Amino acid sequence: MRLHLLATLALAGCVSQPLPPEEAEHRAAAVHLKEAGSKTTAAEQRAALYLASAAESYDLLDSPKSREAARELYNKAATDLVLLLRSSDNGAMWNRPLTLTSGGTTWRLRYAAGNRNGTWDPGRFTSFTAASEVGLKTIDVHNRQDGIGGALVGVRKMNPKEPFAPPIAGITAPVTAVLDFKGRDATLTLVDPSEEPKARVKGSERTLDADFSAPLAYYPQRSEFWTGLMGALRVSHHMGTTGLYMLQPYDPDRIPLIFVHGLISTPQMWRNVINEVEKDPELRGRYQCWVFGYPTGNPPAYSALRFREELAKVRELYPNAKDYVLVGHSMGGLVSRMQATTIDREAWNVIGEDKAAKFFSKVKKGDLIDRATTFEANPKVARLVFICTPHRGSEMALGSIGELG
């Protein structure tokens, strides 16, 4: 929370001394915001107090003396209102019209429906976290913009787990909560700042307050090196980590940009690369970032098979998805390359026809080894980006590290 807002809330309790005009102007909003934070007050009354604070701040958004403080109070009220409504009584107040009363004042609140033009469906998310509460220790550059609205991380975590959802945290997204008022009628809109960097608030287009790093930093961070090492050395304990994971809700209008890590690594290695993609408005408007994770102690051909199977599931679930761009580092480049390569049994004659014939004489059509060694290029792969990929093999495989496999 900004120091200016902390000072405003502190002064809200000081009724015995006169306030400067610029602070007196938004004192009522600060008082209501402070009262709304009381956990001993009923949730419905707290929600009404948050609306009162937001409405009073809303009226001052264009005030020359108070607009900065008013914006901070408005943003805080919008953030805390969403957190309260979504979490109270298992979401009983969420995504339905509400009539809320506090201090003799009655408010009517409605939720704006989601659409394809930058507004989230309120029912999409199972929980929210204030973006300001997410730790950013693993993020090199904090990617955010200052503006109007409550900056949140929207989380969708279902049970049973949905396809392509990260297993621990679920799918996350940047969300900005905006409240608009007509008298005592309020509309709560959840804006996707990735698509709409601005919103109309109080009749004017205003830049949204948004945090694009927090949804990425929300995912639990484990030791990348040790997790990657164990995935290389104790494969059987890490088979369940294999999968394709969407880090954002699926968007049919954006290109899947799929990152594939290398040897002794995990998808966490890409967090700051993805953060840089999200930093660029043009890139984040064009691409949606996914990751493929796998224990690197498995043969690359097997990991490539699992990757093919995951991409086949995407095509089945989202047949109209845009063609993919794959980014592979080291071994991940080999795994990615095999998605755009066709290999049949005849291709294996390069090792010698007799050897190939002997090998395939023991392989049944359609079994695991057959599917891992013969396959067709995926027509949905539009582009490949290789980073330090040993296309012609690596001398490392001949040494002690190679013997581990």
Describe the function of each predicted region.
Residues 271-287:
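Short amphipathic alpha-helix adjacent to the substrate-entry channel of hydrolases
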Residues 52-69, 86, 90, 257-263, ...:
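Serine-dependent carboxylesterase/thioesterase catalytic core
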Residues 270, 274, 304-307:
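Amphipathic alpha-helical segments in well-structured domains
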Residues 14-257, 266-272, 288:
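Flexible, membrane-associating and regulatory peripheral segments of lipid-active enzymes
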Residues 243-245, 276-277, 313, 370-372:
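A generic local structural motif
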Residues 1-8:
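Sec-dependent signal peptide recognition
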